[in-house]
Amino acid sequence: PIREWADFDPAEAPDITEERRWSGVAGARERAGDQYLLASGISLYERVHFLRGLENTWTDLYTNPEDLRSLIDILVEMNLYAIKRYQAAEADGFIFCDDWGLQDRLMISPEKWREFWKPAYARVYAAARAAGLQTFLHSCGYITDILPDLIEIGLDVIQMDQQENMGLDNLSRF
């Protein structure tokens, strides 16, 4: 965990390019055959709050925005590398899981989401689509307020477990 930003050293981030991390990807297309091969990326929001803690993550939006952006950028770069590996492995799609919703609203204001997270998602989705991968996001809770943004930046498929709390009629407009 990164309890204090003074303890944060980007050089200590895991080296995602180490070959041992990719041993399970070799032969994935052959094992999948003609089945859809969905590759998993590194969640952006979930990983940040796992590293910083939930309270620190929300506070960082206001008190340490540049440090927060630096951490998000590292995770984006890791995903960009992963996308290249998954493209080479002939994956069909790319997913990560970030639960943005509560039962009846986002956990973050749409404005702060657009300021901090939308640009990061946009970079990942652009790279995935350029690599020929469909983009997927799993997110629980009420996320209607950012669905247009996600679609705008290249999300192809949203997977959710709580669609009833947003109203199926409401979701059908997307």
Task: Give the ranges of each region predicted by the language model.
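Alpha-helix N-cap recognition
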Residues: 1-4
